[in-house]
Amino acid sequence: MKPIKKAKLLMEYLVMLPGPTNVPERVMRAMITPMINHRSDDFVELYQDAVEKTEQVFKSNGEAVLLSASGTGAVEASVVNLIKKGDKVIIPTNGEFSGRLAQMLEWAGANVIKLESTPGTNATFDQVKEAFDNNKDVKAFYCVWNETSTGTMINYLDKVKNLTARNDAFYVVDGVSIVGGEDLEMDKWGIDVAMTGAQKAFAAPPGISPIVVNNRAKKYMNENPPKTMYFNLSRYFKYYEEAKHTPFTPALPLLYAYREAMNIILEEGIDNRIRRHRICSQAFYSGLSELGLTPFAKEEDRSTVVVALNYCK
């Protein structure tokens, strides 16, 4: 049996995945900060700083909770804290991850209205509008902003608030593979809940997944806590309000790394970072075209952060 090659601290190869992605050395070094007491003033300084910087990146005046979990954990937290048995939920589905989210909603007892589209395309805004027109009692609209499995990206997030506001529905965005690489205006676009994973466009190690909740959704969650311990967000709100703590032991080394990743994003500037991703994305698509390779997603639905290709014939 061949020995397993140990990874070194310095990056020696390019990880061309949706995530985990390459992690800057600054972020890696932050992870070896000595262990601290998670009920200490040192932790308060670390966690509060990371929370506030997360809210800046999401462009939200809501509250960020930094879950020690994968991105799927943050997505599931949104479901168990908002959705009750019999609630009607609209969700576009066009790939693996939107399908998983629809399944989570069904397991929560929701009446799920799936707007299915061919893989490589997105449900159109007109289809979403029609679903709202036909379902006045809808509780929430969920969407996977960036469908990693097919390389598609929804381009009408800024329009959905006109529909959710009309129906007084919650607006939830799964941004696991895109936040930090594309523009997100959470408050401006009327998004109630959004989440991501640290190992994607944030370029941090996997294991921390922020979920940001606005005041309206927070009020609902506090008044209707789920029957779960770890993903009960009202507990996180309470601990943060009272002491800037988390209710359970967090992944401390990962939090140090995560905060350093936030520092790098804000030093570069969110707008500059997004511009860089868009320029690199266009250059990459152009280069692939010159090689005779074709993207799986239709041009108008293509992601700017994840590229999926058709198999070569």
Where would I find each of the regions flagged by the language model?
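Active-site C-terminal subdomain of aminotransferase-like
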Residues: 22-23, 199-286
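A glycine-/small-polar-enriched, mobile loop at the entrance of the PLP active site in fold-type I
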Residues: 12-68, 72
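Conserved active-site segment immediately N-terminal to the catalytic lysine
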Residues: 187-199
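Conserved PLP-binding catalytic core of the aspartate aminotransferase-like
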Residues: 294-313
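Active-site phosphate-binding strand-loop segment of PLP-dependent enzymes
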Residues: 123-180, 193
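Active-site-proximal loop->helix
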Residues: 100-113, 118
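Conserved beta-loop-alpha segment that forms the PLP phosphate-binding cup at the N-terminus of a helix
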Residues: 61-90, 94, 98-102
